[in-house]
Amino acid sequence: MNRPLILVSNDDGISAPGIRALIDVVSEIGDVVVVAPAGPQSGMGHAITINSTLHSSRISPKESEVLEYSCSGTPADCVKLAINELMPRKPDLCVSGVNHGSNSSINVIYSGTMSAAIEAGIEGVPAIGFSLLDYRWNANFNESKDFIKKITENALKNGIPNGVVLNVNIPSVKKSEIQGIKVCRQAKASWVEEFDKRKNPFGQDYYWLTGKFVNNDKGEDTDEWALNQNYISIVPVEFDLTAHHAIQELNEWNFK
């Protein structure tokens, strides 16, 4: 029986521990092709490269069962290049991550991890973005591997609805402390921006972007609530950004 073909990407770079853990998991399930950024691309969102060339190089040994390519572009670039040029056929699934840090709530908008998954969805490939709530480079991904495998197997068996990508966030706790898996809505939270203003040796101002994450959504059906209770959250994300509820109201405007 043929094994499914799985594309793996991320935004932390091809050498990040998170993607290595994800490769370990999905290699047990299917044939794997990895196309990931050569270096960190966190916070790139859905940026694509249009004003310069893209470069890719195979970094896995010839005898390796996993094909691995390093790409000079963004996470979205990686997925575009993989599906249209580097893979032997259209993949059965794309998994992105495992991200070092949360991509819950509004963070999905900024996330390169989720943009890789969303790009796959746009290309007609079922896709999942995985994130662990631990920003450290040496984060422990082993505790989450069984859950990642279970979710991936379910996606392959049951399918993901057309036009939908799954945003999966995993608490950084021991496996025994995970309370289960909850399908949720995205919490209505936001960042309060703060800039650390400094001067360079020439007296010119420059800024470091910092900020605070603020969640005023008290709903118990949100990803933030689930994660705070040590549940794994799954949010089905649509890439059709149409605000359908606003169409009727806007049609009442006078454009004459």
Task: Report residues per predicted region.
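Glycine-rich phosphate/pyrophosphate-binding loops
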Residues: 121-143
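Short, Asp-centered acidic motifs that coordinate Mg2+ and/or phosphate
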Residues: 93
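Electrostatically charged, flexible surface regions
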Residues: 142-256
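Short acidic, Gly/Ser-rich segments with clustered Asp/Glu that frequently serve as metal-coordination loops
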Residues: 12-20, 201-202, 209
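Alpha-helix C-terminal capping segments
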Residues: 82-88, 115-126
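Short beta-strand segments
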Residues: 9, 35-37, 96-99, 130-131, ...
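Glycine/threonine-rich flexible loop motifs
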Residues: 102-111
